[in-house]
Amino acid sequence: MTYVNEMKSKHGGITAHIVKTEKFKTVSLTFKMLAPLTKELVTKRALFPHVLLRGTESRPKTADLRSYFDELYGTSVSADLTKKGERHVITFRLEIPNEKYLKDRTPLLEKGLQLLSELVFSPALENGAFLPLYVTQEKRTLKQRIQAVYDDKMRYSNLRLVQEMCKSEPYALHVNGEFDDVEHITPQDLYEAYQKAIREDQLDLYVIGDVDTDQVKTAVDTYFKTEERELKPFERSAANEQPDPKEVIDEEDVKQGKLNIGFRTNTTYTDPDYPALQVFNGLFGGFSHSKLFINVREKASLAYYAASRVESFKGLLMVMSGIEVKNYKQAVTIIEEQFQAMQNGDFSEDDIAQTKAVIKNQVLETIDTAYGLAEFLYQQASAQVEIPIERFLDNIEKVTKEDIINVGKNIKLDTTYFLKGTGGAS
């Protein structure tokens, strides 16, 4: 069975990925910019996408730009940021109604692609730099976004684990950059960082919906004029592994302790044993039938929540849990016991089958939305590999108990981080 028919084409420095499907009533445009994660650039890269959405060369006023979105039947536009291992990804999303369902047959797809290209490639400028007013306003908003991580103790404890575990590795940088670096950014600095990204980033455009493939290719050639560039090969992230696991304890005025434990998996998205790692994580802490959920949360009642997730491009497995401060040692012990049980193969064939079924359902649910489908396909583009959904699911299905035990033996405990509460906020 073929789940997705993805057509790829090169247009200068951009790779277009067109998925023709009648599943959605809208057409989804997703534009991705990928570059190495660096301290010098991460904060500027977190800022300029939001400045770009404030105005274009032809519609420099934000109000005029938003009015135009409304003219295009309420077209929605957004920008966000993610990390894929030691690389920083900027995403622009634009969703437009499918013109086939409109009475007046406005050429919305072409207008949508033209608008996206203007937002990314033709910003509003003043004296060869971004507009100072927009930069000032978006700097304030970026500071608020960075501060929000510190105020949300679940996100903060995960950030602290990564900072301790990946000290002196680019992955330790937060996707939104550094609070103290925001203030010093000038409109000129920001514009230079933006120009570098346009020149050098890996650029991918996803067009998903009931579209005419040739029409899309022609529009991309017309509106997205970029120079060809040599893509840097995808490389395994550097890791400064320590000889012995470390423990880090912070104290803050919170009621609920946050226990986060980081492991190095030594397996990433392009490795042959990656499917086995996915099943390992599902059995260990990824789902509601996993060991962490059943034994730490349900049976021992030691955690308000307990789960694990894999960072596919960096090679990390991270456990996140919320516990009473007095239960710290007991919780660490029982989590370690669940990990040992996984390494020892203490799980049944039924457990494996259930986990595979949940992973498959999760993938199918993900690709059932245009947003999720673009993200799933982008995993391959960012790693510069071809793994069709059918093969990905087949690889999961083929995983054996021995494969799971073997991948588990490569996983090493690295850092235990505890945000110790002293009462106060949760």
For each feature predicted by the language model, list its residue ranges.
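His/Glu-rich zincin catalytic helix
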Residues: 1-73, 104, 178, 184, ...
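Short, flexible, solvent-exposed loop/turn segments with mixed acidic/basic and small polar residues
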Residues: 82-83, 191-198, 308-310, 405-409
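Compact, aliphatic and Gly/Pro-tolerant "microcore" segments centered on a short helix or tight beta-hairpin
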Residues: 132-195
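Hydrophobic alpha-helical hairpins/lids featuring a short glycine-rich hinge
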Residues: 94, 102-151
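Acidic/histidine-enriched alpha-helical segments
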Residues: 66, 122-146, 234-241, 341-366
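Short, low-order "capping/linker" segments at domain edges
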Residues: 144-145, 245-256, 360-370
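M16 family metallopeptidases and their MPP-like homologs
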Residues: 19, 25-35, 63-118, 155-177, ...
